[in-house]
């Protein structure tokens, strides 16, 4: 009987250790943000002109090394010509526009993804009647400890 009790204790201890070894996300291991909570009316960035709505998701998260934004460019607005300091990805969700990449102008439509590399230059202009809505993603120059 003593051997059975010892075996049972060992089994229970082993199960407890296994449970500790299984990786579980820490409480609060995710953050959810909605458009309405982060939306800000802003002029076209980089002196692009016109009006836009900027959505800076997770901008208050400490030490996050990633920037994730959405921007709605109103008719006639744009993102001005600027040199890229880090790789940056643009993805068009809706609307139409023209993007100038190192002096070459291309049309962008829903489903277009553009990677702009460090040292390149680009600008973006909304065309058509509907807002040009884009996602923008890049590595933060330095993770903020906001």
Predicted ranges, named:
Residues 62, 118-144:
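Ligand-binding loop in jelly-roll beta-barrel domains
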Residues 17-65, 145-146:
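A short, N-terminal "cap"/entry segment at the start of jelly-roll beta-barrel domains
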Residues 67-84:
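Conserved short histidine dyad/triad with adjacent acidic residue
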Residues 1-5:
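Positively charged n-region of N-terminal signal peptides that target proteins for export
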Residues 85-88, 92-97, 102:
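Glycine- and acidic-residue-biased ligand/ion/polar-headgroup-sensing regions
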Residues 7-16:
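Bacterial N-terminal signal peptides
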Residues 104-119:
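Short acidic-glycine-tyrosine-enriched beta hairpin
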Residues 85-86, 104, 120, 130:
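A generic "binding-loop/recognition-motif" signal
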């Amino acid at each position: 009987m003593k051997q059975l009790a010892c075996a049972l204790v060992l089994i229970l201890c082993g199960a407890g250790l296994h449970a500790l070894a299984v990786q579980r996300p820490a409480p609060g291991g995710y953050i959810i943000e909605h458009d309405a909570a982060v939306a800000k009316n802003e002029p076209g960035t980089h002196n692009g002109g016109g009006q836009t709505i900027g959505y800076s998701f997770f901008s208050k998260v400490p030490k996050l090394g990633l920037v994730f934004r959405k921007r709605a460019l109103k008719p006639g607005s744009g993102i001005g010509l600027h040199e890229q300091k880090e790789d940056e990805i643009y993805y068009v969700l809706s609307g139409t526009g023209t993007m100038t990449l190192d002096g070459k102008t291309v049309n962008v439509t829903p489903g277009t993804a553009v990677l702009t590399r460090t040292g390149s230059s680009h600008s973006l202009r909304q065309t058509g009647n509907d807002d040009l809505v884009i996602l923008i993603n890049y590595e933060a120059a330095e993770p903020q400890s906001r």
